[in-house]
Amino acid sequence: MEVIPAVDIKDGSCVRLKKGDFNKRRVYSTSPVDVALYWEKHGASRLHIVDLDGAKSGWPTHLKTIREIALRVNIPLQVGGGIRSLKVIKKYLDSGVDRIILGTVALKNPELVKRALDNFGSNRIVVGVDARGGKVATEGWLKTSQVTVEDIISEMEEVGVKTFIYTDINRDGMLKGPDIEGIKRVLKSTKARIIASGGISSRQDLINLKAIGIKAAIVGKALYEGNLPLEVLNQYP
C-alpha cells in the first residue's frame, strides 16, 4: 500500500483542518516547501498537495509555492484546490506537477473533465470525491450537493476517469479511523482505482483499508501528530 502524506496550504502555511472547517485549523509549519522536503527525506513516494485557499475561492492561490515544491522534490506531486480550467491544469502540469485533482468542476462542469482527459490523459487527471453524509461536497467543502458519491463516480467513470480520491469529510482530521463501510460501498460501485482519505489514525486503519482492496491512502494528521511512525512511508507493504 502506498501511504501518501498530505500537505494542505492555507495562508502560506502548512495546516490541518478538522472536518474541513476553515475556522478549526492547526498550523504545522510556515514553510510548505520544508514540509514537502521532510516527507520526501523520510521515504514518501508521492505527495498530496491541496491549495485550501484556492479550493475556497475557485482560483489557485499558491501556484508559486507549489511550483517551488515541484522544483525542489524528486517525487511525484498530485495537486488539487481551485483547479477549474484547462489553462490552470496546463500551468500546474508545466510546473512539474504529476497529477491534477479535479473536485468541484467534476460536479459543475463534467464536460471540462472530459476535455482534460482528452488533452492530458487519465494518468494525469483524477477526480476528488469529497463526501458528507454520502453526498458530494464542493467549493472547498463549504457546500453540500444532493448528488450521491456513487452517482458522481459513475458519471465520471463514463467520461474516462480511472482514479478517484474518496474523502469522508466528517472523519478528516479527527483521527477516528476511516469509514470502512462507506469505502466498501464505493469499491462495489466502480472498477476504478480508489485512493482513501480521511480519519486514518493508526497502522490498524491501514491494515483494514488494505484488507478491503485499497492500494493507496492519503494521511495527514496522523503523520503530523506522530500517531503513525515515519516508517509507514517506505516500509508499509
From Swiss-Prot:
The keyword Transferase belongs to this UniProt entry's keyword annotation: no
Active-site residues per Swiss-Prot or TrEMBL entry: 8, 130
Catalytically driven reaction(s): 1-(5-phospho-beta-D-ribosyl)-5-[(5-phospho-beta-D-ribosylamino)methylideneamino]imidazole-4-carboxamide = 5-[(5-phospho-1-deoxy-D-ribulos-1-ylimino)methylamino]-1-(5-phospho-beta-D-ribosyl)imidazole-4-carboxamide
Keyword GTP-binding annotated: no
Main location group: cytoplasm
Keywords tagged on the record: Amino-acid biosynthesis, Cytoplasm, Histidine biosynthesis, Isomerase
E.C. no: 5.3.1.16
BP GO annotations: L-histidine biosynthetic process; L-tryptophan biosynthetic process
CDD domains linked to this entry: HisA
Compartments where located: Cytoplasm
GO terms, molecular function: 1-(5-phosphoribosyl)-5-[(5-phosphoribosylamino)methylideneamino]imidazole-4-carboxamide isomerase activity
Pathway: Amino-acid biosynthesis; L-histidine biosynthesis; L-histidine from 5-phospho-alpha-D-ribose 1-diphosphate: step 4/9
Stretch forming the signal peptide: none
GO cellular component: cytoplasm
PANTHER family (alphabetical): 1-(5-PHOSPHORIBOSYL)-5-[(5-PHOSPHORIBOSYLAMINO)METHYLIDENEAMINO] IMIDAZOLE-4-CARBOXAMIDE ISOMERASE (PTHR43090:SF2)
Name this protein carries in UniProt: 1-(5-phosphoribosyl)-5-[(5-phosphoribosylamino)methylideneamino] imidazole-4-carboxamide isomerase
Source organism of the structure: Halothermothrix orenii (strain H 168 / OCM 544 / DSM 9562)
